[in-house]
């Protein structure tokens, strides 16, 4: 017994002497000398935190730490404990042979991730991969102390890298989850989790479906211009039956999904708010349509609170509801998302003199004066050009700081799809700055590029330096909202920038990673998508596809199109093999349509002889049209296919640039279109369709359509301009209770004929 006491005393003395030494949790090639202890009450998140720590230490050092419920006092331990008062926060501290990770039900996980990031140099990128460098030992410094709380209580982004992957979302410390995300208890409770039945925005159509209610109750829907609207409508928010329907559906949805803590009650994604006498009177008193909206949402929230006092009713301050009401305040269980979609993303909100950004600063101040439960819905992508360069990275940090300093507690930043403009990098930056907006950009850029691009990190930083220089130039040119169209005339990022970016990514960076892992090579290849797409889109806007010139040799065609198309197409195919839908998943607009466009350029050949007649078929036009039209099989069309134009009032179905036509400047041309109009009835009245070229406009009424089937309609005769655009769309119908005059409208081709 005396010998045992001496041995124990000796061991304790040695330990005390070594107290000032770093705590080695694992050493490569040695048996584990440290245990992970999950303390009582840590729950499923504590157990999962231990699993994550063990996994990352093993991947880093090759050593698997045992997980125990207790350990001898002299054994080295990592202790994981729950303190619910910390919420998302955590405390990290080293003691005598002990490293403690204490956090709230999410914070305990975040404490583990902070540990492996800080001491294991591990970097989380999203659902593509995690960077885990190999180490000889996993070491925690002696006398280490750290306590953290996030800058924002709620943090989220919809960049595709983390949109639906709960593991990645948790590792990057995002905690606002959207509809359809399944969250197990081990990930901790979500800050906001919406019911499965409805989403978190634009829910009116789901709550009161027009197909279910309009026929018998048109009074439930917007009153506009003397009629109740079924399509492209909102709800009549002063109708008591609408309130009953919505409140009951919200309560039922919360009953059916006990894990949810929020239900969305918000306008459809358009304007057309109800202008009936009662709604209009409230809007006038409140100074905004938000008055009617928030009176309605508050009434729903009051009923929800009776059965679900701890649940949120979420709504939007967006478009026609973004102006705060003068009299009504959101109820204490209403969560208001202020959508700042109009912001100029190229200039910091704090200093921008752009009227849209000045207005947003004002709106943030006015809304925060009304409610502490304001969530900012911000944006970090360009929906008109998802795969083009966008100048928002230099302003991201400043804008996040702006919201932090204004007292915003929850921030959601909407993003794009896989491999959209710097999506992987922006996901990483957003995750770090929503937690701590003061982390220096340079530190994050270095960590990300070293880990993500491997040996191509110098080239990546060269590109980012050049990108930021051009972004500074963008600030003096225009307002960069999330709906900006790039054209050669505007050249927001000039051809010089695109050519330099192509050299960096397609030549220099690829050469640097030829011996790297497949993941690193893939990352570099996908970075090259952006300049390739921009190059092809610029070419597409200026390269002839229709030849009606007597001198075709005078028109330039891209020399490298065929070679570069192979580069571009190869990247798309590799992305699809990995299950990456490029862009935001709009299959026609972001996969079939651009690739047809780019492929046509890759196969383009200049005709050997001149011509006085040519046709722009629906397929040629489709490369430039908007998503309002779809190419369909049509036996009556000359080529067996036609463009079916969406049957919506006044919307453009076909858009075709004269810059894509090789014509002679001195020539006089006659243009006509082959179109088919299918009436809703023989006696239908109203405008069937319209066509426009330059200043010339032709409108055709339904009653003037003489026969069924395709007919030729004259459009223009004279000289042409490369600046002109041919457009065709459905007309402004005599709706008569919402019934359209045209059942179907199809475009076959546009004919060009030289007259002299």
Regions found by a protein language model. Give the residues of each.
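Beta-strand acidic-aromatic groove motif in beta-rich domains, primarily in extracellular
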Residues: 654-656, 679-693, 726
């Amino acid at each position: 017994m005396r010998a045992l006491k001496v041995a124990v005393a000796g061991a304790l003395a040695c330990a005390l002497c070594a107290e000032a030494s770093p705590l080695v949790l694992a050493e490569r090639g040695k048996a584990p000398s440290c245990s992970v202890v999950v303390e009582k009450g840590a729950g499923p998140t504590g157990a999962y935190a231990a699993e994550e720590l063990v996994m990352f230490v093993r991947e880093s050092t090759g050593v698997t730490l045992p997980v125990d419920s207790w350990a001898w006092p002299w054994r080295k331990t990592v202790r994981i404990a729950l303190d619910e008062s910390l919420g998302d926060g955590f405390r990290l501290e080293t003691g005598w042979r002990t490293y403690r990770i204490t956090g709230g039900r999410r914070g305990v996980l975040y404490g583990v991730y902070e540990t492996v990031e800080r001491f294991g140099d591990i970097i989380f990128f999203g659902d593509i991969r995690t960077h885990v460098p190999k180490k000889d030992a996993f070491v925690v410094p002696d006398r280490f102390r750290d306590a953290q709380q996030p800058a924002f209580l709620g943090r989220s982004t919809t960049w595709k890298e983390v949109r639906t992957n709960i593991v990645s979302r948790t590792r990057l410390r995002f905690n606002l989850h959207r509809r359809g995300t399944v969250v197990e208890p081990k990930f901790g409770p979500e800050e906001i989790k919406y019911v499965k039945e409805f989403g978190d925005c634009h829910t009116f159509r789901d709550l009161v479906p027009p197909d279910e209610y309009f026929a018998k109750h048109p009074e439930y829907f917007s009153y506009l211009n003397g009629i109740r609207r079924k399509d492209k409508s909102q709800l009549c928010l002063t109708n008591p039956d609408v309130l009953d329907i919505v409140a009951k559906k919200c309560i039922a949805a919360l009953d059916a999904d006990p894990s949810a803590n929020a239900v969305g009650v918000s306008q459809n994604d358009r304007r057309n708010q109800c202008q009936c006498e009662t709604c209009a009177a409230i809007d006038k008193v409140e100074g905004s349509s938000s008055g009617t909206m928030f009176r309605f949402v508050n009434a729903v929230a009051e009923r929800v609170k009776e059965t679900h006092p701890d649940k949120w009713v979420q709504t939007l301050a967006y478009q026609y509801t973004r102006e705060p009401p003068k009299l009504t305040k959101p109820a204490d269980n209403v969560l208001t998302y202020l959508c700042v979609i109009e912001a100029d993303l190229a200039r910091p909100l704090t200093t921008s003199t752009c009227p849209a950004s000045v207005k947003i600063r004002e709106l943030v101040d006015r809304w925060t004066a009304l409610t502490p439960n304001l969530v900012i819905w911000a944006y970090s992508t360009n929906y008109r050009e998802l795969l083009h360069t966008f100048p928002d990275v230099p302003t991201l940090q400043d804008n996040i700081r702006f919201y932090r300093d204004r007292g915003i507690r929850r921030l959601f930043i909407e993003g794009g799809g896989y491999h959209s403009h710097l999506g992987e990098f922006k996901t990483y930056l957003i995750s770090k700055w929503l937690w701590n907006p003061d982390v220096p950009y340079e530190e994050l850029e270095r960590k990300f590029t070293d880990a993500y691009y491997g040996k191509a990190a110098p080239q990546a930083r060269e590109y980012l330096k050049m990108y930021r220089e051009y972004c500074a130039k963008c600030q003096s040119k225009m307002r960069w909202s999330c709906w900006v169209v790039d054209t050669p005339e505007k050249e927001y990022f000039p051809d010089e920038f695109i050519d330099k970016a192509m050299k960096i990514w397609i030549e220099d960076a690829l050469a640097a990673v030829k011996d790297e892992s497949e993941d690193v090579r893939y990352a570099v290849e996908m970075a090259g998508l952006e300049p390739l797409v921009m190059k092809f889109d610029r070419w597409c806007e200026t390269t002839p596809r229709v030849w009606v010139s007597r001198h075709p040799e005078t028109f330039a065609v891209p020399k490298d199109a065929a070679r570069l198309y192979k580069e571009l197409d190869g990247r798309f195919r590799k992305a699809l093999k990995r299950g990456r839908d490029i862009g935001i998943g709009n299959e026609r607009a972001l996969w079939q349509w651009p690739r047809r466009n780019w492929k046509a350029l890759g196969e383009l050949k200049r005709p050997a002889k001149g011509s006085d007649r040519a046709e722009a078929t629906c397929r040629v036009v489709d490369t430039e049209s908007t998503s309002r039209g779809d190419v369909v099989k049509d036996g009556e069309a000359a080529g067996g296919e036609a463009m079916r134009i969406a049957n919506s009032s006044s919307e453009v179905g076909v858009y075709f640039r004269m810059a894509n036509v090789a014509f002679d400047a001195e020539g006089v041309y006659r243009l006509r279109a082959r179109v088919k109009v299918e009436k809703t009835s023989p006696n239908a009245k109203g405008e069937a369709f319209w066509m426009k070229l330059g200043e010339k406009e032709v409108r055709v009424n339904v009653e003037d359509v003489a026969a069924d089937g395709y007919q030729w309609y004259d459009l223009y005769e004279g000289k042409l301009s490369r600046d002109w655009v041919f457009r065709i769309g459905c007309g402004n119908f005599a709706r008569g209770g919402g019934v359209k005059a045209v059942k179907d409208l199809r475009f076959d081709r546009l004919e060009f004929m030289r007259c002299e």
